[in-house]
Amino acid sequence: MNRIGILSRSDGSSEWKQGSARVICGVNGPIDVKIRDERLNKATVEVLVQPVSGVAETLEKMISSRIVGILEDAIFLNTYPRTLIQVSIQIIEEDGTDTLAAVINGAVLALLDAGISLKYIPCAINCHWKNKITQDEPDVDGTINKLESIITICYSISSEPAKLIFLETAGPIPEEDFFRVLETAPLHAEEVSKKMKELLFETYNESDGHENEKNPKEDVEMDVVA
């Protein structure tokens, strides 16, 4: 289940499930920043990603670097000069295919819960493309070989039409199918944005003591198979 405001020691927090991935995100800030990291006219954004078990390694550091760039562009950094906005992300479940999109959306929800001002809402989706010609050919060890391309796409959602801000692919995909994915992806990203807004509205309505008149919250399915 997708939730916000779940961590009592964070200014904002979220639990977000997307496909095979589930993450818990916490935001603290704006808080004091170390002098060496201080930026005179804007905030510093720090993202820490922890794996399901063990310590952060290359993959988690790679995810962190990607998330920092996305969040720095979305946040009104000049509103919080000489401060730190710290985003901590714990991966609870994953199989490596949906993690990046889940982390992006979970972090954005936690920022919104913390009241951080955003220029727009970044919304990420995953597209899984399978090579239909070879997907049933067994590997040498007898397992089924399913060649798959995983495409993570992030759009900025605001009053303007959705704008592509991030795209990453893992694995080959024919050009025709790739552009077909790009044609439909903005609609799915806008659906993610709608689900986020509904979750925020429902949660704060409940916290104010108002009866929730909407349907029960459901996990958001954002995988688009092209």
From Swiss-Prot:
Major site of localization recorded for this protein: cytoplasm
Keywords carried by this UniProt record: Cytoplasm, Exosome, Nucleus, RNA-binding, rRNA processing
Gene Ontology biological process terms from the UniProt entry: exonucleolytic trimming to generate mature 3'-end of 5.8S rRNA from tricistronic rRNA transcript (SSU-rRNA, 5.8S rRNA, LSU-rRNA); nonfunctional rRNA decay; nuclear mRNA surveillance; nuclear polyadenylation-dependent mRNA catabolic process; nuclear polyadenylation-dependent rRNA catabolic process; nuclear-transcribed mRNA catabolic process, 3'-5' exonucleolytic nonsense-mediated decay; nuclear-transcribed mRNA catabolic process, non-stop decay; poly(A)-dependent snoRNA 3'-end processing
One cellular-component annotation, GO: nucleolus
Single Gene Ontology MF annotation: 3'-5'-RNA exonuclease activity
Region listing for Disordered, in residue ranges: 205-226
Subunit (UniProt): Component of the RNA exosome complex. Specifically part of the catalytically inactive RNA exosome core complex (Exo-9) which may associate with the catalytic subunits rrp6 and dis3 in cytoplasmic- and nuclear-specific RNA exosome complex forms. Exo-9 is formed by a hexameric base ring of RNase PH domain-containing subunits and a cap ring consisting of csl4, rrp4 and rrp40.
Protein name: Exosome complex component rrp46
Species assigned in the record: Schizosaccharomyces pombe (strain 972 / ATCC 24843) (Fission yeast)
Lineage, top ranks: Eukaryota, Fungi, Dikarya, Ascomycota, Taphrinomycotina
Gene name, Swiss-Prot/TrEMBL: rrp46
